[in-house]
């Protein structure tokens, strides 16, 4: 029951952010472009290519721009996010916590950008996705790791305020069911966002619908303390550091 309530809250927040998502999703755009740069060096077979947790179609559009012969099927559980995709694209409204739609199998390529940390059991789900690839097919995922948001966590420790951000996946857990020869590529990247203050930092998270967490909302006095003790740059602004992992998995 708790998971059901959580998933509904996640979906509602993404629905509410859908209209303005593209204006605020700089980190998602950055790693969508990076995924496309890797695709240029891979021999992707013919067949239906899938973007899982596609949101507004940011990654799918990037792939189609670079590879004009590819039409990417977009799967997401947020109806309003899917409605932001171009009309001509194939879209499937589906909760990925329930596996993949029955029609999805023998795919040459599956991608997922900033999605798996919202799923109930990402390790199992990723393995299921991998099993639906055709031989020689690729699964490419990008996701924030548990090492993200060190400034936030440090500030919460210093102020004795509960950390209210997401707990992101541990990379070794995500790939623990894969053999070394199935892990084609794995690399972590740091990405730093900068904001005038923590209030705008937290607003940026809301702007992309990513504010869902399992903690109580911070009180005003707690937010003030976080603003006061968050490490400052030379210009008195604040940074938020992400660690993003990109995994390319290949089915033999």
Label for each model-derived stretch:
Residues 1-18:
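N-terminal, positively charged/glycine-rich alpha-helical extensions of SAM-dependent methyltransferases
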Residues 24-27, 56-58, 185-252:
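Conserved Class I S-adenosyl-L-methionine
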Residues 26-46:
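Conserved alpha-helix/loop element of class I SAM-dependent methyltransferases that forms part
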Residues 50-100:
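Class I SAM-dependent methyltransferase SAM/SAH-binding core
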Residues 108-122:
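A short SAM/SAH-binding and catalytic strip from SAM-dependent methyltransferases
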Residues 123-135:
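A short glycine-rich, Lys/Arg-flanked "PGG" loop and its adjoining helix->strand segment in the class I
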Residues 136-197, 211-220:
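Conserved catalytic/acceptor-binding region of the Class I
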